[in-house]
Regions:
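Histidine/acidic-residue-rich, glycine-tolerant segments that coordinate divalent metal ions
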Residues: 106, 112-174
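Short, acidic/polar
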Residues: 95-106, 139
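C-terminal helical cap
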Residues: 7-10, 103, 107, 118
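N-terminal metal-binding scaffold of metallo-dependent hydrolase/deaminase domains
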Residues: 1-36, 46-47
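Residues that scaffold the ATP/ADP-binding catalytic core of kinase and kinase-like folds
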Residues: 31, 61-62
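Active-site gating loops and adjacent loop-to-helix segments of metal-dependent hydrolytic enzymes
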Residues: 62-98, 124-133, 160-174
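Divalent metal-coordination and catalytic microenvironments
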Residues: 7, 26, 44, 55, ...
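Histidine-centered catalytic micro-motifs
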Residues: 49-61
Length: 174
């Protein structure tokens, strides 16, 4: 049993003061408003419901630092996108799962409890489908399950590359 005490907590009925929350095996067992703090309580100033990250591309977590500094004067979103596609060409489902698991743990540590994962890496680097068409989706789902974050998988399909009905680029065929 774990006992948490909050000076302020946002509960379903609104804000409350002096709230004790008792957890059993990670599940909320009871909530008491207007409580007095006890010696065994772990104290916190504020409690909020878990937040949802509504727009994630977890694999991009591994790119941190690669595009933080602008390059030549002609650098733009499109040059960033080209780098991203070159980067993902080196990833396999195991890489995707490992990177997503790291990103999801970092989200949990930051207060997110759910993630909407925009997932568009469906094929091998050469654009060929995996034997199991859901291979990379299963990797994302395994990462979410391993980390403990709630997942809404949002599969993405590229019919066109940019504007003007251009065929998808090599990176978009993944």
């Amino acid at each position: 049993m774990t006992s948490l005490f909050f000076d302020h907590a946002l509960l379903p009925e609104g804000w409350a003061r002096d709230v004790r929350m008792v957890l059993h095996d990670g599940t909320i067992a009871s909530i008491e408003q207007g409580a007095a703090p006890q010696a065994e309580d772990i104290r916190h100033p504020v409690a909020l419901p878990g937040l949802a990250n509504l727009h994630s591309h977890a694999f991009q977590r591994a790119m941190a630092g690669l595009t933080e500094v602008r390059g030549p004067a002609g650098d733009s979103f499109w040059t960033w996108r080209d780098l991203m596609y070159r980067f993902v060409d080196r990833m396999d489902p195991d890489d995707i799962a490992a990177i997503a698991a790291q990103a999801y743990v970092e989200m949990l540590e930051s207060g997110f409890t759910r993630v909407g994962e925009f997932h568009y890496l469906h094929h091998a680097a050469d654009g060929a489908p995996y034997a199991n068409p859901a291979e990379t989706s299963l990797a994302i789902m395994a990462a979410a399950a391993e980390s403990g974050i709630g997942l809404t998988l949002l599969p993405v399909f590229y019919a066109w590359s940019g504007f003007g009905a251009q065929a998808p680029s090599a990176g978009q065929r993944r």
